[in-house]
Swiss-Prot record:
Transmembrane segments: none
Binding positions (Cd(2+) 2): C13, C18, C32, C35
Organism for this UniProt entry: Arianta arbustorum (Land snail)
Residues where Cd(2+) 3 binds: C20, C24, C26, C35
Descriptive protein name: Metallothionein
Domain notes: 14 cysteine residues are arranged in C-X-C groups. These are thought to be the metal-binding sites in other metallothioneins.
Upper classification of the organism: Eukaryota, Metazoa, Spiralia, Lophotrochozoa, Mollusca
Amino acid sequence: SGKGKGDLCTAACKNEPCQCGSKCQCGEGCACASCKTCNCTSDGCKCGKECTGAASCKCNSSCSCK
């Protein structure tokens, strides 16, 4: 298998790195769901993009905000 993208993510993120698909997510409480990442904004949460808001935002198996 060799080097994974998670290694690159670890190098890029200082605290708690987390690899989701091809995107790197940084920050405390970083969590990746099976539907990849969630995009947290002031008006909601969208799956399929890296998280840009609160770290507490998570996506369930149906790719919807919970």
